[in-house]
Amino acid sequence: FVLNPVHLFHDYVIGEVKSSFNDIFYRGPDLKLDLSVISQEFGLGPGANIECESYDFFTKLYNSTLTRTDDRLYRLYRCAIVDLPLVLDAELNRSAYRGNSIVSGSRLSFVPKTSDISRSICTEPTLNMLFQKGIGSFLEHELQRKFKIDLTKQPVLNRKLALLGSIDGSFGTIDLSSASDSISINLVKALIPDYAFRWLMLTRSPCTTLPSGEVLRLDMISSMGNAFTFPLQTLIFSSLVTACYRILGIPLVYGKDGPQNFAVFGDDIIVRKDAYSFVVDCLTLFGFSVNESKSFNAGYFRESCGGDFWKGHNIRGVYLKELSHVSHVYSAINRLIRWSARSGTMLPKTVRRLFGYIGKTHRWFIPYTDGDTEGIKVPLEFFLSTRDSYWDYLLTRRDVPSRIKKSIVKSRTHPHSRSLKANTVDYLSSTVKPKSYAIPPDDKQECGLPGFHYNGSGLLHSMLGGFIRNGRITLRLNEANRTNVRLRSTSSWNWTPA
């Protein structure tokens, strides 16, 4: 890929985008991105890493072979932790038992996107991911500093502008085809300073292994699975949109929550109607392909960040991926009821059928403030009219666990301090708990965690980081899930979150 400007305005856009990235990566003559900055934000994602037997933090960093694509990454890692005695001791222990490994790159796999389409994702080597997370955190910080975009809140702002655009046509929404796969190495090299480009090249995976075993060289800077992919593409598109605005003479408007007249979240882009055509033209210049079937600048429909809007109404449907666990059924019922309330379309037969999938001893009614997967959300008046008779029924059942019966008795005879407050209501709710393993007191006992080797310093560091709680190593939420019912209280049952 080569940037090939067709007219003078293209040159202006390229210059503005480069200027934005210079501001991001330089502080005057000083470099902003270095090992000290990256190491402060070292981290690992919730997914898998190459040659790791489990998904938890302790296993990946202190109980597995440390994989990387370049030996310089391990030397940099040792430099970063040399002044951290606890981490260094944990690494020396791990290295002596598990060793290190250089791999060619990532491993490609697929996860379902729809019933017909799967999304590709790459499993990264552990050390590559550690550095990618550090770089990604730096990019997120700069994204918020320069463009006031907070990735944790931006989807709400995207939907807000999409809603407004569906009412008065003032904003258009742009969807890109395979955006992350279209960020080529040459594009990034042309836009960002050389020293920052070298950091990205060092930490990325140069190739990936297909399910067939074939090794494929990657010409994109990073894939989905790389921790800096999402903030990097958000920065590129934010820089491009703001450059287009400046050239068109459109003022950039910012509020306390972020930008008010444009929005970027990954490849979800929203711009003013009068800037739409120029932004699309510049996206093509940068090598991106606009998905015209999902991009809208005319009519009353707008789509962004999971919101489908028509004339100011959210017409997004409810998608049910699975109903294999009772928590999935709770979620389906709650989302369908919300959709019915929003659309005015009643679905009594559908909801009644889903309700029938829930066992008679698992029908927990909960307030609107709780999560969709914890029970069925109902008005307070309905809950109070059914609670006593349902709890009496549970007390008579032999198949109801004793801890649930004790919770009912506790609520009725020995209310805890919060229940003594006026208008406070006790109720039972279901939470899904992932499988966890108790840490043995010494290295002479087994843990049960696959491939577990006792590493005292690694366990302590994991505990201090919040990855070990109550002496147990917890796996991902979707691994060996089990349900835990607990007694809770609320004084704001009917309050509906915004």
Report the location of each language-model feature.
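A conserved non-catalytic segment of reverse transcriptases
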Residues: A298-R342
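Acidic/polar loop patches that form or flank catalytic/metal-binding clefts of enzymes
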Residues: R145-F147, V290-K294, G317
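Short, glycine-/Ser/Thr-/acidic-enriched flexible segments
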Residues: D116, T126-N128, S137, S177-A179, ...
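C-terminal, non-catalytic extensions of nucleic-acid polymerases
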Residues: F1-S118, S343-A498
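Conserved polymerase palm-domain catalytic core
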Residues: S166-F265, I270-F286, S293-D308, G344-G375
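Short helix/loop capping segments that flank catalytic or ligand/cofactor-binding pockets
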Residues: R119-I121, F131-Q132, D181-S184, P231-L232, ...
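Active-site-proximal segment of RNA-dependent polymerases
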Residues: C122-I174
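Nucleotide/phosphate-binding sheet-loop regions of phosphoryl- and nucleotidyl-transfer enzymes
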Residues: E91-S95, P125, M129-K133, R145, ...
